[in-house]
From Swiss-Prot:
The gene is bamB. This is Outer membrane protein assembly factor BamB. Its main location: membrane. It holds the Pfam family PQQ_2. It comes from Yersinia pestis. Part of the Bam complex, which is composed of the outer membrane protein BamA, and four lipoproteins BamB, BamC, BamD and BamE. Transmembrane segments: none annotated. GO terms for cellular component: cell outer membrane. It is a lipid-anchor. A lipid is attached at residue 20 (N-palmitoyl cysteine). Part of the outer membrane protein assembly complex, which is involved in assembly and insertion of beta-barrel proteins into the outer membrane. It is found in: Cell outer membrane. A lipid is attached at residue 20 (S-diacylglycerol cysteine).
Length: 393
């Protein structure tokens, strides 16, 4: 089993108590698959690239660009937020959210980790310091900032006048979109040991659908923060603490009244949106967001297999195993192809019909952590180094 995510501080505490073993002593050490040889059927064109601060480095900060209208917004971990022209990559504005100290010392990192989200007149980003920022989309000035219940590790989600934040300690909070005031807080319960990351909510018909570290999917009324239903899709099993992790750190997908959810050590599950009743499930685990499109589900599992399944019943259509343990990003659909990045900075383009590679390109040696983003006719991706790239096909 490949441990894909940094664990919470609680993991270290558990390991120290009573000499507790986190890993099975017989567990194999995984090795990254060699780069597969691909005969490119086309060559994606790099339109522009631009640096955004120092990126995320070796930290597990899931920052990725956001696109709205003619602008692209991106951030680095230290606190630099930048707006760029979507066609050229030229800077429109930049804002530094790092904490100012005296003139002899460098600024303290803002530790940005959740975002970036662009919606309406604001750009939103959250931090490990439990602060959510709203910046004016047109000039980058801070419109408001709010201290939330815990680390904001997932991207803010904006809908129906509220900004939804899922914090690292299992709190789902709704902030007023205009001024950041907290409207309600709901405790979704977090076990002592969990993966470092949280599911960003999906929104449908006035409800927020969110996965929790307790292996449950919850539906919450956005207006009042009232729980509608809760369904467990991942059970605590296994001999080691790692095997018993059952987080749902992936954003659910809602299509035609069905909620699709995916857990780390659990199942790919389809649930009825109205009742939460389980319609079907498959034993597949992941830490990456997935796609539901045209009757198919596309995902990257915890061992970096790329898998296509039928959305009605979960039957496997194909599986691509040539990128095992290359620490793939979540997939995106772009111009009819699946695209994933990997830890060595390659982009892999995959045929959706059979899972075969159609193109491969080396982009940035610092590697990719966060998924690509589709921005109209362009594909955007941000490397660990902070550089944002725009490609066309």
């Amino acid at each position: 089993m490949q441990l894909r995510k940094t664990l919470l501080v609680g993991l270290v505490s558990v390991a120290l108590l009573s000499g507790c073993s986190l890993f099975n002593s017989e567990e194999d050490v995984v090795t990254m698959s060699p780069l597969p040889k691909v005969e490119n059927q086309f060559s994606p064109t790099k339109v522009w690239s631009t640096s955004v601060g120092s990126g995320v480095g070796d930290y597990y900060s899931h920052l990725r660009p956001a696109w709205q209208g003619t602008s692209v917004f991106a951030a680095d971990r230290k606190g630099l937020v930048k707006a760029m022209d979507a066609d050229t990559g030229k800077q429109i504005w930049q804002t530094d959210l790092s904490e100012k100290t005296n003139f002899l010392s460098s600024n303290h990192s803002a530790m940005l980790s959740g975002g970036v989200t662009a919606s309406g007149s604001h750009v939103y980003v959250g931090s490990e310091k439990a602060v959510v920022y709203a910046l004016n989309a047109y000039d980058g000035q801070v419109a408001w900032q709010t201290v939330v219940a815990g680390e904001a590790l997932s991207r803010p989600v904006v809908s129906d006048g509220v900004v939804l934040i899922h914090t690292s300690n299992g709190m789902l909070q709704a902030l007023n979109e205009s001024d950041g005031a907290i409207k309600w807080t709901l405790n979704l319960d977090t076990p002592a040991l969990s993966l470092r990351g949280e599911s960003a909510p999906a929104v449908a018909f006035g409800a927020a659908i969110v996965g929790g570290d307790n292996g449950r999917v919850s539906a919450v009324m956005m207006e009042q923060g009232q729980l509608i239903w809760q369904q467990r899709i991942s059970q605590v099993t296994g001999a080691t603490e790692i095997d018993r992790l059952n987080d749902i750190d992936i954003t659910p997908v809602v299509v035609d009244g069905v909620v699709y959810a995916l857990a780390y050590n659990g199942n790919l599950t389809a649930l009825d949106l109205r009742s939460g009743q389980i319609l079907w499930k498959r034993e597949i685990g992941s830490v990456n967001d997935f796609i539901v499109d045209a009757g198919r589900i596309y995902l990257v599992d915890q061992n970096d297999r790329i898998i296509a399944l039928k959305s009605d019943g979960g039957v496997t259509l194909w599986s691509q195993s040539d990128l095992l343990h290359r620490n793939l990003t979540a997939p995106v659909m772009y111009n009819g192809y699946l695209v994933v990045g990997d830890a060595e900075g390659y982009l892999h383009w995959v045929n959706t019909d059979d899972g075969r590679f159609v193109a491969q390109q080396s982009v940035d040696s610092s590697g990719f952590l966060s998924a690509p983003v589709v921005a109209s006719d362009k594909l955007l991706i941000q490397a660990r180094s902070g550089t944002v790239y725009a490609f066309t096909r």
